[in-house]
Amino acid sequence: MLPSGKSIRILGIDPGLRITGFGVIEKNGSQLTYLGSGCVVTEKSGLPDRLKTILDGLNEIILQHQPEQVAVEQVFVNINPKSTLLLGQARGAAISAAVLHELSVYEYTALQIKQSVVGNGHARKEQVQEMVMRLLRLGERPRPDAADALACAICHAHGGTGLLALSVRNHLKRGGCP
């Protein structure tokens, strides 16, 4: 849950085995401030090396930006089961980075994120990029993976607790984005 009356720093993560997007925002009252975003890109190598790159990259980002909470896009079931499993492993590396720093992790579906940020759960990537740019008063559209991560953080900042909130103590919470 978001504490009321104080600012909070949120790291949003859009997990991917090849490209993991990240975005950091701060919420102070109803004000959202952009702090940074980008992508952790893995080399074409074995799965363990790619997962380590994701874990190490997000660990650096957490140390640099000091978020208090983490919002992660939930894995959707793909037509290709192998792709779904690989994406789940990338997501696991991302969650592990947060848990190593004793941060609570909140999950949101793509539908929840798009509904919260764009007002349409079936919005196109370009619409998400445009709304993220406007909500955070950016000079240009962020890259798609970074925009998705920022949108996830914005969804959480808007008061969502996600389908599952995984705290360090494995305490489950339920809720959703407004």
UniProtKB/Swiss-Prot annotation:
One of its GO terms (cellular component) is Holliday junction resolvase complex. Disulfide bonds: none annotated. It catalyses: Endonucleolytic cleavage at a junction such as a reciprocal single-stranded crossover between two homologous DNA duplexes (Holliday junction). Mg(2+) 1 binds at residues 14, 145. Its main location: cytoplasm. Its cofactor is Mg(2+). Binds 2 Mg(2+) ion per subunit. Mg(2+) 2 binds at residue 73. Its EC number is 3.1.21.10. The active site is at residues 14, 73, 145. It is an enzyme of class 3 (hydrolase). Homodimer which binds Holliday junction (HJ) DNA. The HJ becomes 2-fold symmetrical on binding to RuvC with unstacked arms; it has a different conformation from HJ DNA in complex with RuvA. In the full resolvosome a probable DNA-RuvA(4)-RuvB(12)-RuvC(2) complex forms which resolves the HJ. Belongs to the RuvC family. The RuvA-RuvB-RuvC complex processes Holliday junction (HJ) DNA during genetic recombination and DNA repair. Endonuclease that resolves HJ intermediates. Cleaves cruciform DNA by making single-stranded nicks across the HJ at symmetrical positions within the homologous arms, yielding a 5'-phosphate and a 3'-hydroxyl group; requires a central core of homology in the junction. The consensus cleavage sequence is 5'-(A/T)TT(C/G)-3'. Cleavage occurs on the 3'-side of the TT dinucleotide at the point of strand exchange. This is Crossover junction endodeoxyribonuclease RuvC. It comes from Nitrosomonas eutropha (strain DSM 101675 / C91 / Nm57). The lineage of its organism: Bacteria, Pseudomonadati, Pseudomonadota, Betaproteobacteria, Nitrosomonadales. The gene is ruvC.
